[in-house]
């Protein structure tokens, strides 16, 4: 069984490789939506699957870079636009989804390098291959 680390993760946003800029990714989660289905006589809460799934927001962070054509500032500082995201885990496992850029910010700190943060909201299916 192969084990993979951060050096094995590739992050692509549209055609730009963001792997050299991003150093933190929160959970890439897919969830099934549920509805409570507890009846009056039940002593335990029951959950029913609605049959609908969604991807949770993905937050990425790294060092700010304003490289004109491919850096995180030009790629992620486009609020409201949709990006084609591909995360490659190790050799061939991928998570592919379209996501709207909902938040983008720069985080300057005294005595430290400026960082960026971006939140991407998946729209439609998150395809695991």
Feature names for model-found ranges:
Residues 65-103:
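Short, acidic/charged, Gly/Pro-enriched secondary-structure junctions
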